[in-house]
Amino acid sequence: MPRKILFFATICYSFFLGVMSLVKSSHLPEIDIDNSDKYAHALAYGLLCLVWYLTLCSYNFLNALVLSSFIAVIYGIIIEVLQGVLTEVRTPDFNDFIANCCGIIVVSVIISIRNKTQVKNL
């Protein structure tokens, strides 16, 4: 995928995630699973880490995994703060931040294992 398109897609996903985190969610369908919102947070921020990793790799950034993880964590913190400051319909939740970090960690571990396996196969 051309890196400009990948960069644009990454920015769009980041924006989409921010908007979905700040708008009223009562119009969204509810899932009857305990802590389903925490799974959604883990998935969303794991994906955020992945798309930033792929984008940074396409630009040949050293330590792309560390930087993409950092971007995703900081973005999650900013969104949680904005939920408390900008909206009346959303509230910041430390457990959401923990779920975000869990998703980021899972994706980072998978990427690390994949990268080490690829190097050994050469």
Residue ranges of model-derived segments:
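Bulky hydrophobic segments
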Residues: 1-95, 101-122
